[in-house]
């Protein structure tokens, strides 16, 4: 907030005419006024940041509904049939490398079929969200061992959800 605006606010606050039956306003310390202005700016910035995070739709963790992939993306399905538009840069990560290897083992790759990963949509959303943050190699390895590997076992769906909630608490 510019210094002139602070002085105007201070001037308006201290020079308000109050009637005789009302309490007289005390003057706000300029340091306190500056502190309040910074606090309001910080709160406004948090509000803007919150809107951009929840409104972000281009970078990944959303399910894809269009028939054709966006530029720089490919369409990948999960075992429960959900469809995701995945940025091509994610395909070179350790996590996706392991998911694609498991997919090839379980479903096989032919040039004519869709790519299906052996995990549920919730796991895929978590992986996409994590990769958007550009994690370290150690974090990717931890995700592979705690979240991705249990996806390979179809009978252990409860283990996948337990590992997912534990991983969300850790990261």
Swiss-Prot record:
Places the protein is found: Cytoplasm
Primary role: Involved in the negative regulation of organ growth. May act as a negative regulator of auxin synthesis and transport.
Protein name: Auxin-responsive protein SAUR36
One Gene Ontology cellular component: cytoplasm
Organism the protein comes from: Oryza sativa subsp. japonica
Similarity annotation: Belongs to the ARG7 family.
Keywords assigned: Auxin signaling pathway, Cytoplasm, Developmental protein, Growth regulation
Record bears the keyword Ligase: no
InterPro entries: SAUR_fam (IPR003676)
One GO-annotated biological process of the protein: negative regulation of organ growth
Tissue: Highly expressed in mature leaves and at lower levels in young leaves, flag leaves and internodes.
Entry-linked Pfam families: Auxin_inducible
Further comment: Plants over-expressing SAUR39 display reduced shoot and root growth, altered shoot morphology, reduced size of vascular tissue, low yield and decreased basipetal auxin transport.
Induction: By auxin.
């Amino acid at each position: 907030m510019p210094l002139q605006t602070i002085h105007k606010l201070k001037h308006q606050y201290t020079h308000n005419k109050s009637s005789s039956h009302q309490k007289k306003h005390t003057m706000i310390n300029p340091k306190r006024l500056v502190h309040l202005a910074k606090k309001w700016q910080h709160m406004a910035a948090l509000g803007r940041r919150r809107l951009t995070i929840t409104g972000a739709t281009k970078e990944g963790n959303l399910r894809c509904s269009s028939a054709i992939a966006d530029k720089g993306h490919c369409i990948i399905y999960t075992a429960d049939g959900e469809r995701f538009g995945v940025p091509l840069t994610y395909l070179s990560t350790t996590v996706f490398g392991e998911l694609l290897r498991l997919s090839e083992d379980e479903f096989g790759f032919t040039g004519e079929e869709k790519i299906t990963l052996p995990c549920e949509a919730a796991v895929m959303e978590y992986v996409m969200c994590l990769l958007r943050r550009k994690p370290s190699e150690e974090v990717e390895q931890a995700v592979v061992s705690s979240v991705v590997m249990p996806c390979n076992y179809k009978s252990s769906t409860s283990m996948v959800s337990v590992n997912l909630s534990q991983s969300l608490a850790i990261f």
